[in-house]
Design a protein with these regions (language model features):
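Pre-recognition alpha-helix immediately N-terminal to the DNA-recognition helix
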Residues: 21, 48-52, 113
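N-terminal helix-turn-helix DNA-binding core of bacterial DNA-binding proteins
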Residues: 31-74
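Short, locally clustered residues in the helix-turn-helix/winged-helix DNA-binding domain
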Residues: 23, 51-58, 119, 145
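C-terminal regulatory/oligomerization modules of transcriptional regulators
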Residues: 1-10, 135-157
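N-terminal leader segment of winged-helix/HTH proteins
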Residues: 1-40, 88-90
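The N-cap/first-turn positions of alpha helices
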Residues: 26, 43-49, 111, 136
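Short, hydrophobic-biased segments on the C-terminal half of alpha helices
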Residues: 64, 82-83
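Charged, amphipathic alpha-helical coiled-coil/dimerization segments
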Residues: 5, 83-138
Length: 157
């Protein structure tokens, strides 16, 4: 179904249509992912922190700043997210011995087990895009990178 049919409307031009289409599709995909995460009692930002900790496990422990730089949502309150995950026993948060102002964060075995059990969530997300060929996915990623570079340039000015 086209975006016009989906929203029952028209657009000023193709740029407007592209922006609305991108936003609408992103919200649909995020909702699907949210539903999958909800079954595991974890929010998207919490999942993102755990994913970062797992991915950089060889460099552990990590600082809050290191995690924040890699978050999908750059406005996330990483300290609060880390506190909640610490309360659930999914990570540890300790004072950094070299700099007491810094906190050192590391994923626990319980956190790793949770991520392992969430493999179905990750597979579900992969299937949301499997109607695209490898070439189309590559093109999509190239176009999204190009759009993001434009927004990065505006933030630098």
């Amino acid at each position: 179904m086209s975006i016009e049919e989906e929203l029952k409307g028209h657009f000023r031009n193709n740029y407007h249509k592209g922006l609305i289409n991108l936003t609408y599709t992103t919200k649909l995909l995020s909702y699907e992912f949210y539903q999958a995460l909800k079954k595991h009692g974890i929010a998207e930002q919490q999942y993102n922190v755990l994913r970062i900790l797992r991915g950089f496990r060889s460099e552990a422990p990590l600082s809050i700043g290191f995690i924040k730089e890699r978050m999908l949502d750059k406005d996330s309150d990483v300290s609060r997210i880390v506190d909640r995950l610490n309360e659930k026993g999914l990570l540890t948060r300790k004072e950094n011995s070299e700099d007491r102002r810094q906190k050192s964060v590391e994923i626990t075995e319980k956190g790793l087990s949770l991520l392992d059990s969430m493999f179905d969530c990750e597979r579900k997300i992969d299937t949301l895009l499997n109607n695209l060929s490898e070439e189309e996915i590559h093109e999509l990623n190239t176009l999204l990178d190009k759009i993001r570079r434009k927004t990065d340039n505006k933030q630098e000015n």
